[in-house]
Amino acid sequence: MSIKVIVAGFKGRMGSTAVDMIKNDSELELAALLDPFAAEKEIDGVPVFTDKSDLVGLDAEVWVDFTIPKVAYENTHFALENGFRPVVGTTGFTQEQIADLMTLSADKKLGGLIAPNFAIGAVLLMEFAAKASKYFPDLEIIELHHDKKKDAPSGTAVKTAELIREARAYKKQGAADEEETLVGARGAEFDGFRIHSVRLPGLVAHQEVIFGAQGEGLTLRHDSYDRISFMSGVNLGIKEVVQREQLVYGLEHLL
């Protein structure tokens, strides 16, 4: 039997790519599409909604969310309250919001996934970076995205930094008497190292973690050249959350 899926934010680039992926998988079925700016009533027989409250009672199992940070938490909370298992690629959640959603999902016995990045290569980069940081504690993260991205740093960069913090002993990087002659030149500070965000047209999603040591350096990099790179992770997430009873943060928990 097919897994019935709602896609919130289907008008966006990630949402529309997810719709195409679901249509092309015989194990998945589009149950509904949601976007506040939609003018259509249905697309190829799939009902279209502009208000999530109209989805209460809908026969669906999974809620895929590619919306915007300011509504993603509310959407995910709504999904869990109404029996939909969330698979969320929207970034910008606080740690408190993630913890709240984990608690709610456990109470409801519903699986779910919030993933800063759905590309398998990006998840591997995070894992490799955490491992390398034990031996190369001096590092900087540079994330590069298209110029329409609303949050900075990216969710991928934040998740990478959190994994590094768990693996690396704290170290304040850089000169003790370092001074910025231009405010912000050294980027954002996280656990003693720096994160830099680049926003340019033509980019999709890219990240480097650069490590330095005496006489050597190590650079780990992942590039998503097309949004199709995220769909294997979204597909995996949809099929995994229906078998689980609590939300997880990070695709690595499903690999």
Swiss-Prot record:
- Enumerate the InterPro entries for this protein: DapB_C (IPR022663), DapB_N (IPR000846), DapB_N_CS (IPR022664), DHDPR_bac (IPR023940), NAD(P)-bd_dom_sf (IPR036291)
PROSITE patterns according to UniProt:
DAPB
**Which pathway is this protein engaged in?**
Amino-acid biosynthesis; L-lysine biosynthesis via DAP pathway; (S)-tetrahydrodipicolinate from L-aspartate: step 4/4
The alphabetized list of GO BP terms reads: diaminopimelate biosynthetic process; lysine biosynthetic process via diaminopimelate
Its keywords, alphabetically, are: Amino-acid biosynthesis, Cytoplasm, Diaminopimelate biosynthesis, Lysine biosynthesis, NAD, NADP, Oxidoreductase
EC nos: 1.17.1.8
Where would you find this protein in the cell?
Cytoplasm
Q: Which HAMAP family match?
A: DapB
**What is the name of this protein?**
4-hydroxy-tetrahydrodipicolinate reductase
Record organism: Streptococcus mutans serotype c (strain ATCC 700610 / UA159)
